[in-house]
Amino acid sequence: MSKKQRLSEEDGEVEIELDLGLSLNGRFGVDPLAKTRLMRSTSVLDLVVNDRSGLSRTCSLPVETEEEWRKRKELQSLRRLEAKRKRSEKQRKHKACGGEEKVVEEGSIGSSGSGSSGLSEVDTLLPPVQATTNKSVETSPSSAQSQPENLGKEASQNIIEDMPFVSTTGDGPNGKKINGFLYRYRKGEEVRIVCVCHGSFLSPAEFVKHAGGGDVAHPLKHIVVNPSPFL
């Protein structure tokens, strides 16, 4: 057990501990330099306590811009799906129809004369379209490599047969030869000729005028079918 005794001095009251410990200053439990020592100061005012809260997510784009980017991506994906659906529907309709597209059918033929004379002129102008049939033929490995080339040639020939090359020469003072090809059309549609020099869709009467000719009663008589340079 330790006892404490209070003594009055000039500096004030000093608390002395009486125990069995040794003291180098001659007085038990008294440190004469206790009041002269400086208090330790620190540059840190308060201790920083980390509450370990989750860090906020950072990104290179603002929040609004990121939301707009996501919406744009969703719209693009929806447009792609819509385009794929339309292509599949077109292919399905084309297969259902069997690809039946006639180059010459009854309909309005530009600004030509009567319907009966116009139809007879178109029939004499265009070559007959041959129907292509698919035949299963056993091929060797060497001939199998040439199948893509043959298919490409057949496709180009079918296109050329459907859209033959035509030309006309104007009989006016500024007459010149104009080349083009007959653009395929369906039943009830107007005959159109694509001008090679400008890429314009013209009626037979406009095609003759484009070559420098005047107004003619039967413009199809002035248009000549030429052999294709690709055959």
From Swiss-Prot:
Keywords of this entry: Nucleus
Bias (Polar residues): 130-152
Protein localization: Nucleus
Inactivation phenotype: Exhibits hypersensitivity to salt and slight hypersensitivity to glucose abscisic acid (ABA).
Gene Ontology CC: one annotated term: nucleus
One GO BP annotation of this record: signal transduction
Biased composition, class Basic residues, residue ranges: 83-96
Homology family: Belongs to the Ninja family.
Record text on subunit structure and interactions: Forms a heterodimer with AFP2. Interacts with ABI5/DPBF1, DPBF2, AREB3/DPBF3, EEL/DPBF4, ABF1, ABF3/DPBF5 and ABF4/AREB2.
Biological function: Acts as a negative regulator of abscisic acid (ABA) response and stress responses.
Protein name: Ninja-family protein AFP3
Source species: Arabidopsis thaliana
